Swiss-Prot record:
Family: Belongs to the pyruvate kinase family.
Site positions (Crucial for phosphotyrosine binding): 433
Modified residues (Phosphoserine): 37, 97, 100, 127
Keywords: Acetylation, Allosteric enzyme, ATP-binding, Cytoplasm, Glycolysis, Hydroxylation, Isopeptide bond, Kinase, Magnesium, Metal-binding, Methylation, Nucleotide-binding, Nucleus, Phosphoprotein, Potassium, Pyruvate, S-nitrosylation, Transferase, Translation regulation, Ubl conjugation
Protein name: Pyruvate kinase PKM
Cross-link (Glycyl lysine isopeptide (Lys-Gly) (interchain with G-Cter in SUMO2)): 115, 266, 270
List of residues binding Mg(2+): 272, 296
Enzymatic class: transferase
Cross-link (Glycyl lysine isopeptide (Lys-Gly) (interchain with G-Cter in SUMO1)): 166
Organism: Mus musculus (Mouse)
Amino acid sequence: MPKPHSEAGTAFIQTQQLHAAMADTFLEHMCRLDIDSAPITARNTGIICTIGPASRSVEMLKEMIKSGMNVARLNFSHGTHEYHAETIKNVREATESFASDPILYRPVAVALDTKGPEIRTGLIKGSGTAEVELKKGATLKITLDNAYMEKCDENILWLDYKNICKVVEVGSKIYVDDGLISLQVKEKGADFLVTEVENGGSLGSKKGVNLPGAAVDLPAVSEKDIQDLKFGVEQDVDMVFASFIRKAADVHEVRKVLGEKGKNIKIISKIENHEGVRRFDEILEASDGIMVARGDLGIEIPAEKVFLAQKMMIGRCNRAGKPVICATQMLESMIKKPRPTRAEGSDVANAVLDGADCIMLSGETAKGDYPLEAVRMQHLIAREAEAAIYHLQLFEELRRLAPITSDPTEAAAVGAVEASFKCCSGAIIVLTKSGRSAHQVARYRPRAPIIAVTRNPQTARQAHLYRGIFPVLCKDAVLNAWAEDVDLRVNLAMDVGKARGFFKKGDVVIVLTGWRPGSGFTNTMRVVPVP
């Protein structure tokens, strides 16, 4: 028998924590994790960055893309349409600056985060950056009088929810700025409340307000949201992060506003309160994905229960094969410091181990002093965490839970992932039009990156929502002979994989293709050595 080619099967991508990956039990897997095992070169988890004053210049955006940003999030709680239009233009300009080289080009998605039915305070002394100190025990009057909309200070605070006096009682608590400041209601009038500061701190302009336990009667989609969503459709955004989704009907309402023209926009529902957690299954059913928005969630439900909600939501999303994003305070201290706390490093890693498809940065990239360092840090932590996943058990369970199906794409996807484990493949190459074939493969959480080749730019951008998909945009004209066109795209994926260090000549890759043109015909799996 001829000796096997000495390089074959040593795909270095698979040596990462391989000893641990082959363990028989989860405990043994943990015992075998090795801090000196080099991680994989590809990162499978998507990184979403909020774009703000610290990061909206084209130059900075280029650096962020190089550092690993996959999705640019625009927070519509702040800023005008002109402001956001300029940011979108800058993101696209930064992305396209890499377009001359199809090997290195990375499509970046644009996400619109709605303001939603949230309550915010007014401006402090007319300035977006001013702050005032609220002292514990002090009296603070809350007013609905618009004369104070831009004149808030340490004595009087305007907020934008007109029915607040109807839904809070004397003794109710009001939380401001992600719960950092707490107020207790002492008396209520027709259009004002008198509160005592329980927990003080410095208060900035336009901060979020939470009323835990109050039956807040705000519409799921406000007038502002409708205008913002229509603006998003015009601007051709790729996804919407819908704030404060409480039930499936809220998601349908967002979809209705997006209309026919925005029917391909993915709707990611943000779960931010008790009702959203309680009705999670119906919301998941109606949505394209879920965001675990831990900021507001951690005020609306007790802080010590947030991790339970996070694990439950990520688990159910993984089971259903829908993307899930873990967000809020992931590297919060990096707003002001170049290194994260140990707890934050652990938090990012554990979100990845829980099964999150994407991890998100908010203030860290929007207004922080170290936006690039934050992106790089998430990239490095995610890579290490991905290597430490106990894939043996995960794949077994995902396969057991998946319903029996006669759909050729689903069956081929399971086969491709199983084969990728067996032969330690350097990557799984998928040719996909709508993206569905790649999503099916991602659902089974392979160790190897999924290189998804598509000619549809939106499919490429939206693919970042799914764990493990590395989208490649093919800009070549379609060849007449179907087989030649397949080879053209597979070869592009091979070139990208080699250039990115995912695999080298002689390694094995899995190739998943269709047997004829069009969507819905993916059914052929091949095991191919890299040329």
